[in-house]
Amino acid sequence: MASCSQHLLSAVAIFSVLAGVATATSIYTCYEGMGLPVNPLQGCRFYVASQTCGAVPLLPIEVMKDWCCRELAGISSNCRCEGLRVFIDRAFPPSQSQGAPPQLPPLATECPAEVKRDFARTLALPGQCNLPAIHGGAYCVFP
């Protein structure tokens, strides 16, 4: 009888360890379609362009900001920085200002991509969406 209890206890312990590893792995899995929506934060494109480069807003600024912040809030705090990075790289590629074809149609093409990229990096900060990231703060560090 003790042998059966030991086996059961061992099985529970192994299951707990495996569940912990699976959870830890999935928390930090931030890819499009897994932890991130496909093509994340598209509602932020027009907001960023209107705030940085004088692009004519399609909607009132408050509406665009709210839409952008809701999209960002919908991404787990563990994946927010990666979501911002994917969004920035796709919506405002650095090559856009260097003549290479952008992945998305450019907004406010007369405005350097770096200006839009720098502003987009601040979207989680208190002055914008005020959302925590994985570090417990809102600041995301990426190239």
UniProtKB/Swiss-Prot annotation:
Record carries keyword Signal = yes
Query: Domain of life, per the record?
Result: Eukaryota
Record field: transmembrane: none
Signal sequence coordinates: 1-24
State one Pfam family annotation.
Tryp_alpha_amyl
**Record-linked SMART domains:** AAI
**Is Cytoplasm given among the entry's keywords?**
no
Q: Where in the cell is it found?
A: Secreted
The free-text tissue note of the record is: Endosperm.
Q: Tell me the GO molecular function terms.
A: serine-type endopeptidase inhibitor activity
Protein's job = Trypsin inhibitor. No alpha-amylase inhibition detected.
User: What PANTHER family does UniProt report for this protein, alphabetically?
Assistant: CHYMOTRYPSIN INHIBITOR WCI (PTHR34481:SF10), TRYPSIN/FACTOR XIIA INHIBITOR-RELATED (PTHR34481)
The protein's name: Trypsin inhibitor CMc
Source organism: Hordeum vulgare
**Gene this protein is translated from:** ITR2
